[in-house]
Amino acid sequence: MMQYSPKFNNAKVLVLGDVMLDRYWFGATNRISPEAPVPVVKVQDIEERAGGAANVAMNIASLSVPVALHGLIGQDDAGRALDKLLNSHNIQNHCVALDSHPTITKLRILSRHQQLLRLDFEEGFHHVASDSLLAKLEQEITAYGALILSDYGKGTLESVQQMIQVARKAGVPTLIDPKGTDFERYRGATLLTPNMSEFEAVVGHCKDDDEIVEKGLKLIADFELTALLVTRSEKGMTLLRPNQAPFHLPTQAKEVYDVTGAGDTVISVLATAIADGRPYEEACYLANAAAGVVVGKLGTSTVTPTELENAIHHREETGFGILAEDELKRAVEQAKQRGEKIVMTNGCFDILHPGHVSYLENARKLGDRLIVAVNTDESVKRLKGESRPINDLNARMAVLAGLASVDWVVPFAEDTPQRLIGEILPNLLVKGGDYKPEEIAGSQEVWANGGEVKVLNFENGCSTTNVIKKIQASK
């Protein structure tokens, strides 16, 4: 099978739609309120994430693709929080800030990895500033390879038909994740991406794949679409186009923790691939792989190029293996939110031997996920001498990543991983050898965060130095 690339060097995407701020309050629930039969949540952590059309833009930016966001927000704290989030991800924020309406905000309260309550703060933007949005679209559309119209029914896309016509006139593909049953308003769009429930709400119940194809092709003809992608949860997705065979893709999700924002990820990757000049089949393949990654995360999330590449190559799990430091931080954050215990260790691991394998297996048994931080080649030379390492960094990390006991491998350039450990803050820090816990780099940071530090024994007679001596003696 052809291997597709997650690098989109020629893509540039414009997103226009209902912009929201997603707030998450995480906390422990250990008692019932004396005031009413409801749990008391002691809030321990607060997160703010871009939602709606803003999450679509975040998904595109996470793929290192230029993206601009148009929409409506309020002149309030939520709007300022969104602006800060978007700027931190290099998203061109062209949203109109109004003093007459609040930013649409959704607050979710979670405990023990379960959502207890959602609070919506919104008035919508019906009959507000549609002329301004349309004028800005006309000015900028020709600079982009694709337009996403993100419709959550909040009023930003009241002029959606005129927006579609502006894009058609400019020759720019328009992709829409539809809302409601009035698909007439999307007439002339390039591609719609309804989920199965949304699709059946318009065409009626479909008893099998043949009926999905039949009714989907009729919908394409009725509303003058170029294509239709029906996302079907555990059954994957189906791409339909006139006079072409249907293209079915099975789901790639291994574990599903949260489907929040999965539709945003699908349309983001689709539009990015199409803007990059990829065929529809390839765009759908990439979008399907990305969806399989994002549903394994908690809350509104994005997918990185590394995660997408892992999924494309059918690696056993996405978001694992060799990661850059920023990618590891995101992966660890998601794992902690799922309640997983993170174990971390470090070393040169120059020539992997049975002692290493046994040590890493024992470390992994102490938690749910194991991080191995590896000295770079320059760091090894400073510690071990100019003749080391025998194997370069890429080779050492590749071997470690292939072990079943290892979830993440990350390089560090310093002599010790103290800074990295302080950034990651594992639940358990492990080191092999004759150390005292307080002598281990990073131990103070882990203890200060409420974590543990343990020393594990290496197998007697197993060392890289002994392996090198045996090799030299055999020559």
UniProtKB/Swiss-Prot annotation:
Quaternary structure and interacting proteins, as annotated: Homodimer.
Pathway annotation: Nucleotide-sugar biosynthesis; ADP-L-glycero-beta-D-manno-heptose biosynthesis; ADP-L-glycero-beta-D-manno-heptose from D-glycero-beta-D-manno-heptose 7-phosphate: step 1/4; Nucleotide-sugar biosynthesis; ADP-L-glycero-beta-D-manno-heptose biosynthesis; ADP-L-glycero-beta-D-manno-heptose from D-glycero-beta-D-manno-heptose 7-phosphate: step 3/4
Name of the protein: Bifunctional protein HldE
InterPro entries: Bifunc_HldE, Carboh/pur_kinase_PfkB_CS, Cyt_trans-like, PfkB_dom, RfaE_dom_I, RfaE_dom_II, Ribokinase-like, Rossmann-like_a/b/a_fold
A GO BP annotation: ADP-L-glycero-beta-D-manno-heptose biosynthetic process
Organism whose genome encodes this protein: Actinobacillus pleuropneumoniae serotype 5b (strain L20)
Keywords attached to this entry: ATP-binding, Carbohydrate metabolism, Kinase, Multifunctional enzyme, Nucleotide-binding, Nucleotidyltransferase, Transferase
MF GO annotations: ATP binding; heptose 7-phosphate kinase activity; heptose-1-phosphate adenylyltransferase activity; phosphotransferase activity, alcohol group as acceptor
Gene encoding the protein: hldE
CC annotations in GO: cytosol
Residues that coordinate or bind ATP: 195-198
Region (Cytidylyltransferase): 344-475
Gene3D superfamilies xref list: 3.40.1190.20, HUPs (3.40.50.620)
PROSITE patterns from the UniProt entry: PFKB_KINASES_1
E.C. number: 2.7.1.167, 2.7.7.70
One family name in Pfam for this protein: CTP_transf_like
Family of this protein: In the N-terminal section; belongs to the carbohydrate kinase PfkB family.
Ribokinase: annotated span: 1-318
